[in-house]
Amino acid sequence: PYTTLFRSTSLLGASSAALLNALKELAHINDDIPLISPNIIEPIQKLKVNALGNHNPRLHTDEVLIALAISATTNPVSHHAYQMLDQLANCEAHSTVILSSVDANTFRKLHVHLTCEDKYQTKKLYHN
């Protein structure tokens, strides 16, 4: 029953933001409360770009779940959201663009039913 649009931010891809917001909704956590501190996200971004040579610093869904798991060890609010992962099973998600294989696979592993528009996020010939 929820319709929400998500766009990429400087820290997260749109799929990652949608995933965190779905967990917040399930856990009844106020939208203004961050589940993952930028102090956790930013070093991961630096690792992705500087050490691993990625061009996109934004966290994919699998990376944001790892960051959430780390946050959950010290933050009770993050822990509560993390415990909601099982509740995502059989939920439906729709993207207005074709997701990366990483994000699509993460939703599949979480048993989220995903549909996508027939449009790529970028104009690159290959889409990972």
What are the language-model segments listed below?
Residues 2-5:
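Short, small-residue-biased leader/transition segments that mark boundaries at the very start
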Residues 7-8, 97:
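Active-site proximal loops enriched in glycine and acidic residues that flank catalytic Cys/His/Asp
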Residues 8-11, 74:
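Generic alpha-helical structural element
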Residues 10-27:
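A short, polar/charged loop-to-alpha-helix boundary motif
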